[in-house]
Amino acid sequence: MAHKKGTGSTRNGRDSNAQRLGVKKFGGEVVRSGSIIVRQRGTKFHPGVNVGRGGDDTLFALIDGVVTFERKGKGGKKVSVYPAGEAA
C-alpha cells in the first residue's frame, strides 16, 4: 500500500500566445514602402491604392507616403497610401 498520496493531474494549464493583430500605422502617419499597416485575420480592412495584401491578409505599403482609411461601400473599410504631397 502506498504511504504517499499520489498527486492528481489537471486538464487546465495551457494558454496560447497573443497574435499581436491590429492597426500598426494609423491615418495620417507617414510610412515607407513595405511598412506593415494592418495585421489581421480575414479582410476586415481591404487594400486600396498603393497597398498590398500578404498571404496572411496583412496589409502593407507599396510606396512611401501617408496612410488614409476610407469607406468601401456599405460597412466596408479600405486602406490606401498616397504620396506625401497629395494625401487625400
Swiss-Prot record:
Asked if the Swiss-Prot or TrEMBL record annotates the protein with the keyword Protein transport, the reply is: no
**Gene Ontology terms, cellular component aspect?**
cytosolic large ribosomal subunit
Alphabetized GO MF terms: structural constituent of ribosome
Do you know which Pfam families this protein is assigned to? Ribosomal_L27
What keywords appear on the UniProt entry?
Answer: Ribonucleoprotein, Ribosomal protein
UniProt key word Transcription: no
Q: Where is the composition biased (Polar residues)?
A: 7-19
Where are the stretches annotated Disordered?
1-23
Name any Gene Ontology BP term: translation
Per the record, the similarity remark reads:
Belongs to the bacterial ribosomal protein bL27 family.
Query: This chain belongs to which protein, by name?
Result: Large ribosomal subunit protein bL27
